[in-house]
């Protein structure tokens, strides 16, 4: 789904290139070295010749159904909490506020659901 989405139009392509560039900078900040993928960024700077121009569309939500929602950012935050929290780490960064807040809310909802918290 993501490869189809990025080829849909130049705005999606630009967004993904900028996201990739930011990820490379973040990797260098956290680990003090350059990711091997970074050597490809200059090759990917220019749009593919046959890509159409168009307005940005939200990236596909490639995740379990229970994480999906109308807001793509919120859906991916939920996905990280449900599916990735057991091994998520933030080297040289504070844990994002959204992660702590949503994780606390999710734990409360799960406890209510399985009967640990009574009304």
Enumerate the predicted regions with their spans.
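Sequence termini and other peripheral, non-core segments
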Residues: 1-119
């Amino acid at each position: 789904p993501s490869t189809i989405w990025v080829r849909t139009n130049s705005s999606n392509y630009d967004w993904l290139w900028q996201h990739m560039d930011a990820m490379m900078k973040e990797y260098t900040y956290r680990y003090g070295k350059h990711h091997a993928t970074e050597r490809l960024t200059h090759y990917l700077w220019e749009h593919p010749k046959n890509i159409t121009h168009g307005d940005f569309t939200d990236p596909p939500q490639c995740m379990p159904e229970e994480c999906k929602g109308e807001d793509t950012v919120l859906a991916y935050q939920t996905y990280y909490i449900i599916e990735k929290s057991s091994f998520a780490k933030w080297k040289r960064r504070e844990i994002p506020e959204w992660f702590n807040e949503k994780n606390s809310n999710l734990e409360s909802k799960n406890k209510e659901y399985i009967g640990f918290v009574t009304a």
